[in-house]
Amino acid sequence: EILIGLVGSEMCIRDRDNCNGILLAWYPGARGGRAIADLLFGKESPSGKLPITFYKDLEGMPEFTDYSMKNRTYRYMEKEALYPFGYGLTYSDTCVTEAEVVGEVSAESDIVLKATVKNNGTVDTDEVVQVYIKDLDSPLAVRNYSLCGFKRVSLKAGEEKSVEFTISNKAMNIVDEDGNRYIAGKHFRLFAGAVSYTHLRAHETDQYL
């Protein structure tokens, strides 16, 4: 059984364990049926990523009247998500095999990161390589990683490609209680992966200012 979700936000999927797969089609428009059929019958490979987080239960979701950031969005979640921000599968088997920062890292310059992504499967597909950053020093930094770059890459079966990201030095900023933005930490961790920062098919690299 395949569950097809025509929704505008996250939803409760109580029967997910009884499903062989879940296809989230959002509101696909007039030609949505044809697009869904192409995916279901293998004419195309799915390659989208979640722009939101699916919580495991209502207890984990903040109240709509609560404006604090505690446990809100992927950047502040304290528990494991059901399906995290950035999650999404394809019909193939892709992974990031290498990731490295090019040149020196400083507070005044952008960060250049090169990643290698490979399609180890037998199906042509697109993959979205995602880059996240985390400040490991500042007490004002967000709890988890923050998305700082992504690129869609088309990969033939067995193909490997190199992808370069230019990450703004603003990605290293924190925001204090007065709304001021500045770089407070000296130790940052960059993560490049093909699923999301919570999954292991990725590479991490530590950088110091």
Q: Predicted segment positions?
A:
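Short, conserved secondary-structure segments in the cores of folded domains
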Residues: I2, V101, G149-K151
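Terminal connector regions
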Residues: K170-R201
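Secreted, periplasmic, or luminal enzymes acting at the cell surface/secretory milieu
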Residues: S9, R14-D126, Y132-K134, G185, ...
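Single conserved hydrophobic/aromatic residue that forms the stacking wall/gate
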Residues: E1-I13, H199, D206-L209
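Active/binding-pocket-proximal capping segment
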Residues: Q130-S138, Y145-L147
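Intrinsically disordered, low-complexity Pro/Gly/Ser/Thr-rich segments with frequent PxxP/GP/PP motifs
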Residues: V142-I174
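Short coil/turn motifs at secondary-structure junctions
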Residues: N120-T122, L136-S138, K170-M172
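Short acidic/His/Gly/Ser-rich catalytic and metal-binding motifs that mark active-site loops
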Residues: R14, L140-A141
